[in-house]
A protein has these predicted regions:
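Short, conserved glycine- and acidic-residue-centered signature motifs
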Residues: 21, 212, 322-325
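A short glycine/serine-rich beta->alpha loop
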Residues: 11-17, 205, 316-319
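Conserved serine DD-peptidase/penicillin-binding transpeptidase domain
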Residues: 34-308
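Buried hydrophobic packing segments
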Residues: 27-32, 273, 329-333
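A short, well-structured edge-of-sheet supersecondary motif
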Residues: 1-11
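Short active-site loop at a secondary-structure junction
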Residues: 10-30
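Surface-exposed aromatic
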Residues: 9, 60, 242-243, 313-317
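C-terminal soluble interaction/assembly domains
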Residues: 294, 307-343
Length: 343
């Protein structure tokens, strides 16, 4: 009982257990303590050279901020801001700068080969739509034929292995399975099972292997859509020298992002926030270890424990390496309830 500081039941209190999604509570509190609830992620488009007669005579750079909430409409808004500056052509390359985070996209202890919806999603500093593509499965007309499979948006490097069939079964029978396997650097989406002839179109959200590549492809397509010519290369750089801001987008305040993270148990939000607090705390690219260090130190400080065997390696709690004792969690909850200004 928190208000009375009373223990009603105790068993295996000092043993280490996997915290699962409870770990997001520690990330949320550490983020508020490190960044503040009004902190925002800021994604910028920069350029070098000069703009002459609507032509950028140099490179165009998107500097990712690690914003987990960045969506396609936000990316299109950046392109519209560029268009309002009367930019009609980019002579240089399109550079995606991901220096905010390190290059280790997958968390320690994750199952790299099997990625479920919303989980084990690779983390990069420039992520669009949480690194997910939509897979639409639509019925065909003839029994035993394969259903139609569509990827939206269609991203290079994704291929479909459609082994499903159409069948005269109940449309509510859940016999269709969609999952992803990595194969020689490609994302292979496996569609198996049976789909009812009477089924409505079904949507599955699947993680991509390289979120920044996915986002860069969409940005290039949006430039073309809005009449901005670009025939250069798409490059990925961790140390761009461009400094002049051409367009920018900022996320909702951290308070709102954390609320969404906790309400919907969002793994991508938790992992991006973990790396971001490592980036801000240590002044260098956010990594799994430095973000986890901030969370663990804050956890033990609030729990008022000098020595603890708690292990924190990611933000989402997905990793099998994460371990914490019920005693530490209870002490942390008690003290956060009493003292923490954001509780």
């Amino acid at each position: 009982v928190l208000d009375e500081d009373k223990t009603l039941l105790e068993t295996s209190a000092q043993e280490l257990f996997h915290p699962g999604s409870a770990q997001k509570l520690f990330v949320a509190a550490a983020a508020f303590n490190t960044l503040g609830p009004q902190f925002v992620f800021r994604t910028e488009v920069l350029f070098d050279g000069a703009i002459e007669s609507g032509v950028i005579k140099g490179d165009l750079v998107i500097k990712g901020s690690g914003d987990p909430s960045f969506r396609l409409e936000d990316l299109e808004n950046l392109v519209l801001q560029i268009k309002k500056k009367n930019v009609k052509e980019i002579l240089g390359n399109l550079i995606i700068e991901c220096s905010e985070f390190d290059e280790i996209r997958m968390g320690p202890g994750w199952i790299w080969d099997l990625q479920r919806h919303g989980g084990n999603i690779p983390v990069e500093a420039f992520v669009l739509n949480q690194g997910l593509v939509d897979v639409w499965i639509k019925p065909s007309d003839i029994s035993m034929n394969a259903p139609h499979v569509e990827i939206d948006p269609l991203v290079p490097g994704i291929c479909v292995s459609n082994k499903a069939i159409m069948a005269n079964i109940d449309p509510y029978e859940k016999s269709l399975k969609v999952r992803k396997k990595q194969q020689r650097g490609k994302d292979v989406i496996l569609v198996e099972g049976a789909l009812s002839l009477k089924s409505r179109p079904l949507k599955f959200s699947i993680p991509v292997q390289y979120p920044a590549h996915f986002a860069a492809t969409e940005f290039s397509l949006l430039l073309k859509k809005h009449g901005i010519k670009h025939e250069g290369k798409i490059l990925f750089d961790h140390n761009s020298c461009c400094k002049e801001v051409l367009a920018s987008h900022q996320s909702a305040p951290l308070f709102d992002l954390v609320k969404k993270m906790l309400k919907f148990d969002n793994d991508m939000y938790a992992n991006c926030i973990l790396k971001k607090i490592g980036r801000i705390k240590f002044g260098k690219p956010g990594t799994w270890p430095n973000g986890a260090q901030v969370v663990r130190e804050f956890l033990l400080d609030v729990a008022a424990k000098e020595v603890d065997e708690a292990v924190i390696v990611d933000g989402s709690g997905e990793s099998c390496f994460n371990k914490i004792s019920p005693e530490t969690v209870a002490l942390w909850l008690k003290n956060i309830h009493k003292k923490f200004v954001y509780a």
